[in-house]
């Protein structure tokens, strides 16, 4: 069995490399960069992006799972579910996470479930590669919306829906991105503390208090007619936040009656405000890149903009030097 899995893994890696090389020379890589104005985005019911959001007063989230892991929480209820937003071409990033901080077997006696979140790609080759990857690792879920920057909110809501439907008895959930390094020791033992009673209606991360950017050239541009207020409610940076599992269902159900926004973290903040849940500030969450040093990284929970190579290097260094004092 092990040799079969190894062969499948090697085959998948080779196929990924071949496919990505082919795509790089035959297709543009900026199909879904989010640089186009809203009016140019696809508007078909199953394939819509946020171009038609102004005419949609509610969000029915009528998408189907193309890839699912409905039994992932069946045998053992996880203490923590990790939802990682990723894109089809980021195989190396997913594999780096599987082999480092996202390894579900890192903590004896503490069940962790790691899942990568994806939409549907316009390229059937990439969809097929992700399906093969899923058959090997069983840690990917996909719904049939177009995977794009402007649909990150749908991706997060898919994760919330999955937890509420298939893993509602978990204690905590983390939502993060594929270029984030997570100090799991700090997250598990210093923040969540498995020996204590699980919290309810709990939400924490790097809290941002700000308002909409009206410059159309900005990545975070927010049209006035989509969000007319001058301030956002407090929200946690989408690079990484933690919440009690009961909040997943609360946010998902609230989203069904809350006008969608393309800025995922802002939208989650809007849902929290409706629910009367105030996100707590935690200085361990960083939404920027930070130069590596052993002692510095021992004090944090998340660090942004980490490449797969850096992920391995940081993990190996921290794992081999646990006996050293700072």
From Swiss-Prot:
Name of this protein: Beta-1,3-galactosyltransferase 1
Localization: Golgi apparatus membrane
EC number, as in UniProt: 2.4.1.86
Gene3D superfamilies: 3.90.550.50
Source organism per UniProt: Mus musculus (Mouse)
Molecular function in Gene Ontology: N-acetyl-beta-D-glucosaminide beta-(1,3)-galactosyltransferase activity
Keyword field contains Nucleotide-binding: no
Distribution of this protein across tissues and organs: Ubiquitous.
């Amino acid at each position: 069995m092990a040799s079969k899995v190894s062969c499948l893994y090697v085959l998948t890696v080779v196929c990924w490399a071949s496919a990505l090389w082919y795509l790089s020379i035959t297709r543009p890589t900026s199909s879904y960069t989010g640089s186009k104005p809203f009016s140019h985005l696809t508007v078909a019911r199953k394939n819509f992006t946020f171009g038609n959001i102004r005419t949609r007063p509610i969000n029915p989230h009528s998408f189907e799972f193309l890839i699912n892991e409905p039994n992932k929480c069946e045998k053992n209820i996880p203490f923590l579910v990790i939802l990682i937003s990723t894109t089809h071409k980021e195989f190396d990033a997913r594999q780096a996470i599987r082999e480092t901080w996202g390894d579900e077997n890192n903590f004896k006696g503490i069940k962790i479930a790691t899942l990568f979140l994806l939409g549907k790609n316009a390229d059937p080759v990439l969809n097929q590669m992700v399906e093969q990857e899923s058959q090997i690792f069983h840690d990917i879920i996909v719904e049939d919306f177009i995977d794009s920057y402007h649909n990150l909110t749908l991706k997060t809501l898919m994760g919330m829906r999955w937890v509420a439907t298939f893993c509602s008895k978990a204690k905590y959930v983390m939502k993060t991105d594929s270029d984030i390094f997570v100090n799991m020791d700090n997250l598990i033992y210093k923040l969540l503390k498995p020996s204590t009673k699980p919290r309810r209606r709990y939400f924490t991360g790097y809290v941002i208090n700000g308002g909409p950017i009206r410059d159309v050239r900005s990545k975070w541009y927010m049209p006035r007619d989509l969000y007319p207020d001058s301030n956002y409610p407090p929200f946690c940076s989408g690079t990484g936040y933690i919440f009690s599992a009961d909040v997943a269902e609360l946010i998902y159900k609230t989203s069904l009656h809350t006008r969608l926004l393309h800025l995922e973290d802002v939208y989650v903040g809007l849902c929290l405000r409706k629910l009367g849940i105030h996100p707590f500030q935690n200085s361990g969450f960083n939404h920027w890149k930070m130069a590596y040093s052993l002692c510095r990284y021992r004090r944090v929970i998340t660090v942004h903009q980490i490449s797969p190579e850096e992920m391995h290097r940081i993990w190996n260094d921290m794992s081999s030097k646990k006996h050293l004092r700072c």
